[in-house]
Amino acid sequence: CVNILYIQAQGAGRKPFVKDIFKWNELRKVPRMSMYFNNMDTYHISYAVTGVASEDKPEYIRARRYMPQWEKGLEGTELKPEYLNTGLFKIGVTYHLTFIKYETNLYMNVKGDGQDKTFYFDASAFPKIDKGRVGLRQMYTRNSKYANFRVYQLDK
């Protein structure tokens, strides 16, 4: 199961992909990743939960910086580092996730199953984003449960 958090997401700014992504959510009913990375200006943190016998894929935590103005799709959007085979996520286990974006630094903290780990991503090589919406996305063929979802903004 792949889950994605979009942080400060905005549209590309051209019709129909106006800055406020809520205004074109109908266009995202068909789950095509290219609809997101070609038309959203955003930070993205994703994590994959494995453990499905029919899949031989590594568990991962990674981040990207979507930049539709570059017109390169996903090419060159990776934030470093990437974390593979963390051993964290197990199917059926509840986790508490905390995401922090400060300036061009992204953090993801995972607590659960007796573990507490924090992951860091450096976005300083990319244009900074300072406004936009927060969004969730997951593979449409999978299930995840979300509870107590909150967004905070710190005063400067």
Residue positions per predicted region:
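Secretory/extracellular carbohydrate-interaction modules
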Residues: 1-72
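Predominantly extracellular/luminal cell-surface or secreted proteins
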Residues: 8-10, 109-113, 152-154
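Extracellular structured ligand-interaction cores
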Residues: 32, 94-96, 105, 133, ...
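Acidic/His-leaning functional-site neighborhoods
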Residues: 64-74, 101, 118-124
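Short, aromatic/His-centered strand-loop micro-motif at the edge of beta-sheets
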Residues: 70-96
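Carbohydrate-binding surfaces in secreted/extracellular proteins
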Residues: 86-123
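Flexible glycan-contacting loops in extracellular carbohydrate-active proteins
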Residues: 119-145
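Extracellular beta-strand elements of beta-rich domains used
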Residues: 147-151
